[in-house]
Every structure is written in structure tokens, then in C-alpha cells.
Amino acid sequence: TAYEIKECEWSSDVCSSDLGPDFQNLHRNKRSITLNLKTKEGVAALKRMVKKADVVVENYRPDVKRRLGIDYKDLAKINKKIVYASISGFGQTGPYADRPGFDQIAQGMGGLMSITGLPGQGPVRAGIAIADLTAGLFAALGILTALLEREKSGKGQHIATSLLQAQIFMLDFQSARWLIGRSEEHMSELQSHSFISYAVFC
């Protein structure tokens, strides 16, 4: 089928709900619809919603959304005021643009794993999906800025961020030390290379 609508029974007693904690955390205050965008009917249903929408957020690879006919250029023809936010693994252009992304891959490629943990331990990932969360925050900031700008121009725009971009941003101190002093970062016995008295004390 092209699309499916399911009603979730939300309860004020979240602890006894049949919906798991992750589902409740991520989907509270949302209305959901599942679309099969590999069908003409599914794409048509999406485009009907876009006519009245303010924002579209998507995390398809660039080649996939172009193939489906739902990239920014396609949807802006339907609604010129649409703010279209893309969150991808490696950005909309470049040699890795059409590769799928995953939080742990971004942590590794962005350099975070190489400075997390203790010396001799090997690369360690952060305990949370930090690249996912940071990229989402960047997208939210971009959306809000685009909506504010739209109040003046009357036009929407395409904003984009990526897991890798967000992860590299998180290593701003390390990047500055390398660019200016060619100082290479290493795992650091729970101490900071930037600040005095920034460590774990017992």
C-alpha cells in the first residue's frame, strides 16, 4: 500500500504504557504516517502534505531523494516557502555524499574516538549517539533561522548538515591546536589539553 495510518494509544501513565521508553521519548507530541515512497501514490501523498507544510526534515542519501523525486528542487516547485532540512552522513556533495552514515562511523572519522578513553586502550566511542544528537541540533538551529528569514523574504530554503560535519565541529579545540601549533591530540588520562584543573580527581 502507498501509506498507512496507525493510532497510538498514549497514556498519561508512561511507566505502564505498552509503548517502550525509547518510542515515547522520541515520538511524544507527534502524529505519524508511514509512506511508501517507492510508489507513485506514496510520493503523491507526501507532495499533498508539502503544499501546506512549513518544514520538511529528511535523512536520505542525496542520490536516493533525487531518484524518488523528493529533493528540495522538486518540493520547492510545490511550495516555494518550504524549509527543507537535510541530515546526512557525509553531506550533500563530495566523494562520500552518497554513502550511508551511522553515528559510530562519524565518531571515528571525525576523530572523537581517537581521543576518548585511556592511553593504550584503543579507540572508544562515546556512550551516546553524540553525532546524531549534534547534527539534529544544528538542523534545528538552521530551520529556526530559515523560518525567521522567510518572514522577510517570503521564500523557503534548503539547509543541510551531516553527522561528520557535526562531529568535526565538536573537536574545535583540537583542530585549532593542530592548525596553529601542529599539536596532535592523544588520549589523555582523563585530563584536558586546554584547561588547568580540568580532570577527574579522587
Q: Where in the sequence are the language-model features?
A:
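N-terminal Rossmann-like NAD(P) cofactor-binding subdomain of oxidoreductases
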Residues: 58-114
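Short, small-residue-biased leader/transition segments that mark boundaries at the very start
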Residues: 1-16, 186-192
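A contiguous active-site-proximal alpha/beta segment in oxidoreductase catalytic domains
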Residues: 29, 82, 104, 133, ...
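Active-site beta-alpha turn of Rossmann-fold NAD(P)-dependent dehydrogenases/reductases
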Residues: 30, 85-88, 191
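A structured beta-alpha segment of the ubiquitous adenosine-cofactor-binding alpha/beta core
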Residues: 21-77
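Hydrophobic/aromatic beta-strand patches that form the interior of the parallel beta-sheet core
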Residues: 33, 83-85, 159
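Acidic, glycine-rich segments within the central catalytic cores of soluble metabolic enzymes
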Residues: 17, 109-188, 192-197
